[in-house]
A protein has these predicted regions:
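Long, hydrophobic alpha/beta structural blocks
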Residues: 171-174
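GHKL/Bergerat-fold ATPase module
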Residues: 182-186
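Extended, charge-biased low-complexity segments
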Residues: 1-165, 187-231
């Protein structure tokens, strides 16, 4: 093992250079990515130690959800239908079907949205799943986020201090959905999502993404990557 005598001194760099063999190519650094990919046979429910044929797991309780998404055996519409549960009345069923069939689903509006959410979620270590989903909504638009920025921390949001005067109606519905996810209440209810007059298409996609994120965790974001690989 090489021992450097000048380590932590101004002469350390010179010593390293002197001890390096001529034409030596240093090894690269980075992450080693496995080429292994899960298949449907690898993630069969009946092979799971928790398998009970009489009482199958709910998807939000599945310990192999990430692997099942990678294998392509769990689709977005399946997650969405379980997420809403028995509250899917006909107009909402129709809107959800139309939305999922119209175009590949994207959780984030764009790179700026993804970067804002990732940055502030990482800064607030220990944030609950509910608040991470609310943060997903509140970071979707820069104007909305600037009103929220100084009124939250890892423990949650101070909604009473946030001022929304003059805000666009679409952003208002997104804000109310975030508040409902974070602290509960009936600021916006499931039935409201069925009507585009109350919730725009863009807001509907964002709220759907936040609900999935809240119920299943960040693993659902892999659905977006999986969609990109198949298109």
């Amino acid at each position: 093992m090489t021992r450097y005598f000048m380590k932590f001194t101004p002469l350390f760099a010179a010593e390293v250079q002197m001890m390096t063999p001529p034409r030596h190519q240093p090894r690269g650094s980075g992450r080693i990515r496995s080429s292994f990919r899960y298949s449907a046979d690898d993630v069969r429910c009946k092979d799971c130690t928790r398998y009970d044929s009489g009482q199958p797991c709910h998807l939000n309780e599945c310990v192999c959800l990430e692997e099942r998404i990678e294998a392509g055996v769990v689709e977005l519409n399946t997650l969405a239908r379980e997420c809403f549960g028995g509250r899917m009345f006909r107009p909402l069923q129709r809107r959800l079907r139309d939305e999922l069939n119209r175009q590949p689903f994207r959780f984030f509006l764009g790179d700026a949205h993804r970067e804002r959410w990732t940055h502030w979620k990482n800064r607030c270590y220990g944030m609950s799943g509910r608040n991470a989903a609310a943060l997903f909504l509140l970071t979707a638009d820069e104007e909305l986020w600037q009103r929220v920025l100084w009124h939250f921390d890892s423990s949650g949001f101070d909604f009473s201090a946030i001022r929304l005067s003059g805000i666009h109606p679409e952003l208002y519905s997104i804000y109310q959905a975030a508040k409902t996810i974070s602290v509960g209440g009936d600021n916006i209810v499931i039935e409201d999502l069925a009507f585009s007059e109350l919730v725009s298409d863009r807001a509907f996609r964002l709220i759907l993404g936040a609900l999935l994120l809240c119920r299943y965790g960040e693993v659902v974001l892999n659905l977006e990557r999986k969609t990109e690989e198949t298109t």
